C-alpha cells in the first residue's frame, strides 16, 4: 500500500433537519473531494441531519417542537441515505467518514460511519457519552464503539467532539494502531471550549499524543441555520453565523492544510505521508516503547451493552405473549449486515 495520499476535511452547512437533502449534499461533496484527488474525506459530527443547535438557543420547553421535527429526520444505519453515500464512495473510489443522528428502536444516537473506497462499511460507532444537553436527546454508546479499521489509505479511527478530550479514548485508539484520526465536530460556537482556536489546540495535542494525522471537520451556520433554529427575533443572529474551523494536522502538530474563514463552506486538503509516523513513533509511542504497563494499565470492556438481554425458554414452547411483542421499529435491532457488506443499490445483491 502506498504511504502517501491526499486527505480532505469538510467545512459546510448541512440542510438543517432534512436527512435526504443532506445525503444528496454529501454525495456532491464526495464527488468534489474525489475530483480534487482526495482518497479520504471527513464530514462533521451529526452531519445528517445537522447538529441540533436549537438546544443552545432555546429553553427546555421551547425545544420540544424542534425535537419532534429532529427525531423524524434521524436515520437508520442501513437506511437509503446511508446506501446513497456508500454508492458514492464506491463510484468515486474514495473512503469517507460522516456523522449522523441514528435511530435504533425509539432511541437516537450520535453515530459515525467509516466507509472504504470500495463501498464497504468499516466502522459503525456511537458517541460513548453525549455532552451536556445532548444527553436529553441522545443515548450512549459502549466499549464496542472504540474502533480502528484498516482501510485503503491506512488504519483509521474516529471520535465525536469532546470525545477527543478523553485521555482513555485516545489511548484506546492509539493502542489499536491508529494512523489517521477523524475528529468530527459541530460548529465552533456556544461555549468557550468550542472556540475554534481551542478545538484546534485539542486536535494538535491529539496528533502529538497518538502520533497520528488528524482530520478535523466542522459544520457552518449560515442564514438558513438561523432560520431553522428560529432565533432571528430572539438574539443578534450575527453571533451565531459561521463556526467553521476545518483543519488537518500532522503528528508534529503542524497545520498541513489551508484554512477557510469561519463563514465559508468548502473542503480543505492535505498531502499525507504515513512515513512521518515512523519518526513520530520513534520519538514517542505512548502505547508501545514509551509506555509503562507495569505502572499503568487500561482495561476496556468492548462487549455490546443492549438495554434488554433475553433468555429463551429452554423447553421450546411457544410463548402466548409473542403476539403482543412490539413492532421491529419499537426495539433496537442489531444490524448484522451493517459492517463489511457492499452497497445494496450499486449493482450488488
UniProtKB/Swiss-Prot annotation:
Which reactions does this protein catalyse? a nitrile + 2 H2O = a carboxylate + NH4(+)
What SUPFAM superfamilies does this protein map onto? Carbon-nitrogen hydrolase
Give the disulfide map: none
Q: Which InterPro entries match?
A: C-N_Hydrolase (IPR003010), C-N_Hydrolase_sf (IPR036526), Nitrilase/CN_hydratase_CS (IPR000132), Nitrilases_CHs (IPR044149)
Residues of the active site are 45, 127, 161
Q: Does the keyword Hydrolase apply?
A: yes
EC number of this enzyme: 3.5.5.1
One GO biological process term is: response to herbicide
* Pfam families noted in UniProt: CN_hydrolase
Where on the tree of life does the source sit, at the highest rank?
Answer: Bacteria
> Does the keyword section mention Acetylation?
no
Alphabetized GO MF terms: nitrilase activity
Query: Keyword annotations for this protein?
Result: Genetically modified food, Herbicide resistance, Hydrolase, Plasmid
Please report the stretch or stretches of sequence annotated as the CN hydrolase domain: 5-274
Q: What class of enzyme is it?
A: hydrolase
| Quaternary state and interactors | Homodimer.
Its job: Specific for the herbicide bromoxynil (3,5-dibromo-4-hydroxybenzonitrile); converts it to its metabolite 3,5-dibromo-4-hydroxybenzoic acid.
**Leftover remarks:** Introduced by genetic manipulation and expressed in bromoxynil-tolerant cotton by Monsanto (Calgene).
The similarity annotation says:
Belongs to the carbon-nitrogen hydrolase superfamily. Nitrilase family.
- This one is known as Nitrilase, bromoxynil-specific
Which species expresses this protein natively?
Klebsiella pneumoniae subsp. ozaenae
> What taxonomic ancestry is recorded?
Bacteria, Pseudomonadati, Pseudomonadota, Gammaproteobacteria, Enterobacterales
